[in-house]
Design a protein with these regions (language model features):
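Beta-propeller domains
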Residues: 87-92
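Structural helix-adjacent loops and short alpha-helical linkers that scaffold large soluble proteins
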Residues: 78-85, 144-146
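Histidine/cysteine- and/or acidic
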Residues: 188
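Intrinsically disordered, low-complexity activation-like regions
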Residues: 1-63, 69, 73, 93-110, ...
């Protein structure tokens, strides 16, 4: 993590003050790494909306950029005000490190069409890191950081989502004609949750920052996140039992078709088994996909 910050500092020395390697080692030590990563998983996200599954997280193999963003997010929302202040001072450097990471830049400027199936773990983690650092920086007290995220970083993330076909990612684990494959499910589910989070960021920017939509509703050909009902998706044994049970129900359509069904005169309601597994997170994704304005939401609440 220190190397990530050191590398980006050497490219932008004019932006920040002196880089004190001893100070960084004091902050990124063995004790704080464990504490703040635990804080991320326990206090900053709900299980159903996690884009990084705790049971699959491995400190030894996770990329430094994703580890850095998880660490800073955990520190920023942990109980220690001192740690929060220390983390805040490093957020801009972390943002530059994530978005200037060569792996992420290759995805941004990729000239060849790709599918989400072709993404490797390092590439997925670079996208996860980008989503997380945007989430942190949207709440930055500094106007320049919020503006940079709005006009530069989020559009880059949208470009990656389109270039890698995250907008079309499907998870066919519920299809009885497709053999159950735990590894494929986890990869697809991670990509689906990433795209769901990117969609919700678009909704946030429309509602609170008055920006135009980056996507059209017809682009949202991705499945909704799975309803895990408190099980550990990372455990292959419990997952297979859960998946077999879930196959008794129909899954909702991809988001773009789901929105069409929701707004049609033939909408059967939530009593239909096809929609019985929706949770709060998936409903937020559906509303986000509609590109709501404050006026639209107000009309829904009347």
């Amino acid at each position: 993590m220190i190397d990530c910050l050191s590398e980006v500092y050497s490219s932008h020395e004019n932006i920040w003050g002196p880089f004190d390697i001893d100070l960084e080692r004091g902050f990124f030590n063995e004790e704080t790494v464990g504490e703040f990563i635990d804080a991320y998983f326990e206090h900053t996200v709900r299980p159903r909306s996690r884009i990084v599954l705790k049971s699959l997280f491995n400190l030894e193999t996770t990329s430094a950029h994703l580890l850095l963003t998880i660490f800073l997010l955990g520190a920023n929302f942990g109980p220690s005000e001192g740690a929060k202040s220390q983390a805040t001072r490093r957020l801009d450097m972390a943002e530059y490190a994530v978005f200037e990471n060569p792996t992420f830049l290759q995805l941004v400027y990729n000239q060849q069409p790709r599918t989400s199936d072709s993404l490797n773990q390092t590439e997925i983690e670079s996208i996860q890191a980008a989503v997380l650092i945007i989430l942190i920086q949207l709440a930055s007290p500094k106007a320049d950081a919020r503006r940079r995220v709005r006009i530069q970083r989020y559009p880059a993330l949208v470009s990656v989502a389109r270039a890698t076909s995250l907008t079309q990612v499907r998870n066919r684990w519920h299809d009885p004609t497709v053999p159950l494959n735990h590894a494929n499910f986890l990869k697809n589910e991670t990509c689906i949750r990433l795209m769901a989070s990117i969609t919700m960021l678009d909704c946030h920017n429309i509602m609170f920052l008055n920006t135009p939509p980056q996507f059209t509703v017809t682009e949202f050909g991705f499945d909704l996140p799975a309803e895990e009902k408190g099980i550990d998706l990372g455990d292959s044994a419990t997952w297979e039992i859960w998946a077999q049970n879930e196959r008794e129900y129909q899954r909702p359509s991809p988001l773009n078709r789901f929105i069409q069904e929701l707004l049609s005169d033939d909408w059967p309601g939530l009593e239909d088994p096809k929609y019985s597994n929706l949770n709060v997170f998936t409903l937020f994704v559906v509303v986000s996909g509609k590109h709501p304005t404050p006026q639209f939401l107000a009309s829904m609440l009347k």
